[in-house]
Amino acid sequence: PSWEEIKEMILRHTRMQIELKGEFTGIREMRKHIAWYTAGMKHSAGLRRDSNLVSSYEELEKLLDFRG
């Protein structure tokens, strides 16, 4: 899949997690999923590192737009 497809899947998954568990828990749990979604991608270590600092959906969206 392309980066745009992966990014949209991450954001969709994040929205579902937030709906189910709230933003605080949903974002924290998505950190490991982001690592799974980006495993094997070139230069993904920085994205995984930076995603561990994200605390809101908006921050994640900005990070993914910046990294893309």
Listing of model-derived features with the role each one plays in the protein:
Residues 1-68:
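Alpha/beta catalytic cores of nucleotide-metabolism and tRNA/nucleoside-modifying enzymes
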